[in-house]
């Protein structure tokens, strides 16, 4: 009797959770809460689960595409930027001046990318700093900066172009304003309408909408369910065996 009950509860759990899929894993607690709140605000059913390596966000499979797109358009999950402690660890061996300069330059790029990513509407930001080059006559070409910003079409990012250039100019000493190049590109909406997706009748939608009634019914009639599942598994096994024999002969 105990074995039957364990099998029944396992099957029941599978039916009630089979339509949920992982959205993101290993998230920090605060970021997971922000993402969950954003999804709930847009009526996307989601839940979080604490794991050993962080928080896992789960959503219904039918809402997976819209959940990913909604978070993407709002810059989630956030990029992890390199810090000076990681670039210059205390136990690091002595590096060449050229390598040290490259690391410092990379940290500057990361710092500017981090500031731009904090702006409302910025999905992704990339910054490249070209260091001065010297010719044979010791004449140095000035530094230049190239910036690429992918932003949400819900925000008029072009209105901030001048302020972004001012921010970059002040972040790099000696940089000429005319040597700053910025390319902005709006992201495309790839969200799907929720209504057409619901026109198809799925038994899992019914189960989710009536979990309490389903649980009571299954607890009252566990054996018919077990017999049905056994027949289903047997039928699947027969089909697999049939196709394997056809491929062999």
From Swiss-Prot:
Q: Where does it live in the cell?
A: Cell outer membrane
Q: Give a GO biological-process term.
A: protein secretion
PROSITE patterns, from UniProt?
A: PROKAR_LIPOPROTEIN
Q: Which residues cross the membrane?
A: 225-245
Induction data:
Induced in low magnesium. Induced in macrophages. Expression in host cells is dependent on an acidic environment.
Signal peptide positions (record): 1-18
Cite a GO CC annotation: cell outer membrane
Specify the superkingdom. Answer: Bacteria
Lipid attachment, kind S-diacylglycerol cysteine: 19
Lipidated sites in chain (N-palmitoyl cysteine) = 19
Task: List, alphabetically, the Pfam families matched.
Answer: YscJ_FliF (PF01514)
Membrane topology according to the record: Lipid-anchor
Q: What happens when the gene is disrupted?
A: Disruption prevents SpvB-induced F-actin depolymerization in human macrophages without affecting intra-bacterial SpvB protein levels.
| Record key words, sorted | Cell outer membrane, Lipoprotein, Membrane, Palmitate, Protein transport, Signal, Transmembrane, Transmembrane helix, Transport
Q: Relate the protein's function as given in its record.
A: Component of Salmonella pathogenicity island 2 (SPI-2) type III secretion system, required for secretion of some type III-secreted effectors including the SpvB toxin.
Q: Which NCBIfam families match?
A: III_secr_YscJ, PRK15348.1
Family, as annotated? Belongs to the YscJ lipoprotein family.
What is the designated name of this protein?
Secretion system apparatus lipoprotein SsaJ
Species per Swiss-Prot/TrEMBL record: Salmonella typhimurium (strain LT2 / SGSC1412 / ATCC 700720)
